[in-house]
């Protein structure tokens, strides 16, 4: 499959765009370098987070696509899922409920490595600490169970959006968390019925990737996680390793 037709440097697409109205720290993070991929998830370059999230670069004919991940952290004792509500300071999808942690591996040493999704796993550990205060020492790369990848496109508003190949990672690592208020406005552990009730409540808003993953994958995996409790009665993400695949699901 052919790669997107990008005229380097991609940053020319952001000339003249002022970010003065946004939170200073979130603007700084927009300069992080994301990994550009084609629809087969073959990496071919890098661009700033700002460049990657502008709808003018996401829409055809530019079709800019980058690599991402979504972590689903379950409490071992009862299999409840940790949700976060994105801070209002976020530039994309502010104030929305989503899965435990969603972000991007960066084009830096250690996170570009693809074997066994090691770069994505390292990025997940880094962002769990940044967003939720979970020490990286408690979430080593092998603590995550990789399940699949999805390819989706979703606008946030007229200016910003997402176009990602998103790696889905489950974890049942026992841990405490403290939300970074610049990233997270609320957290909540929910059971499967509680999450289903949240989806039915129109007063709640959810990120598009979380809704897509829940619709097509999450609840089936969750059922399996609960059904495969260990001898202590605890859930273990490692029990789902046989459900992983090498596909990229176009959503």
UniProtKB/Swiss-Prot annotation:
Annotated localization: Cytoplasm
EC supergroup of this enzyme: isomerase
InterPro entries (alphabetical): IsopentenylPP_isomerase_typ1 (IPR011876), NUDIX_hydrolase-like_dom_sf (IPR015797), NUDIX_hydrolase_dom (IPR000086)
Major location category of this protein: cytoplasm
GO cellular component term of the entry, any: cytoplasm
Amino-acid positions noted as binding Mg(2+) in the UniProt annotation, renumbered to this chain: 53, 66, 162, 164
Keyword Cytoplasm annotated: yes
Disulfide bond sites: none
Active site positions: 102, 164
Family statement: Belongs to the IPP isomerase type 1 family.
EC number of the protein: 5.3.3.2
Cofactor(s) in the UniProt record: Mg(2+)
SUPFAM superfamilies the UniProt entry points to: Nudix (SSF55811)
Protein name as annotated: Isopentenyl-diphosphate delta-isomerase
GO molecular-function terms, A-Z: isopentenyl-diphosphate delta-isomerase activity; metal ion binding
Reaction catalysed by this enzyme: isopentenyl diphosphate = dimethylallyl diphosphate
Gene3D superfamilies listed in its UniProt record: Nucleoside Triphosphate Pyrophosphohydrolase
């Amino acid at each position: 499959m052919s790669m997107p037709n990008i005229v380097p440097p991609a940053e020319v697409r952001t000339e003249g765009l002022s970010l003065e109205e946004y939170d200073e720290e979130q603007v700084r993070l927009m300069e992080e370098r994301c990994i550009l991929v084609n629809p087969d998830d073959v990496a071919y370059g890098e661009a700033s987070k700002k460049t990657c999230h502008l709808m003018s670069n996401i829409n055809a004919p530019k079709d800019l696509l980058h690599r991402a991940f979504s972590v689903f952290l379950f409490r071992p004792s009862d299999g409840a899922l940790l949700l976060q509500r994105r801070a209002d300071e976020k530039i994309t999808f502010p104030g929305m409920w989503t899965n435990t942690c969603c972000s991007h591996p960066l084009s830096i040493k250690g996170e570009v490595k693809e074997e066994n999704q090691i770069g994505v796993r390292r990025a997940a550990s880094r962002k769990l600490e940044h967003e939720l205060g979970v020490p990286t020492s408690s979430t080593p790369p092998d603590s995550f169970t990789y399940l699949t990848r999805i390819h989706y496109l979703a606008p946030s508003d007229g200016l910003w959006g997402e176009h990602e190949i998103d790696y889905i990672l489950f974890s049942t690592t026992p841990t405490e968390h403290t939300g970074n208020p610049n990233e997270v406005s609320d957290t909540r552990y929910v059971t499967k019925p509680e999450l289903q009730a949240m989806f039915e409540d129109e007063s709640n808003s959810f990120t598009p990737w979380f809704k897509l993953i829940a619709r097509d994958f999450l609840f089936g995996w969750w059922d399996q996680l609960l059904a495969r409790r260990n001898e202590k009665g605890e859930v273990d993400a490692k029990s789902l390793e046989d459900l992983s695949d090498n596909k990229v699901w176009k959503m």
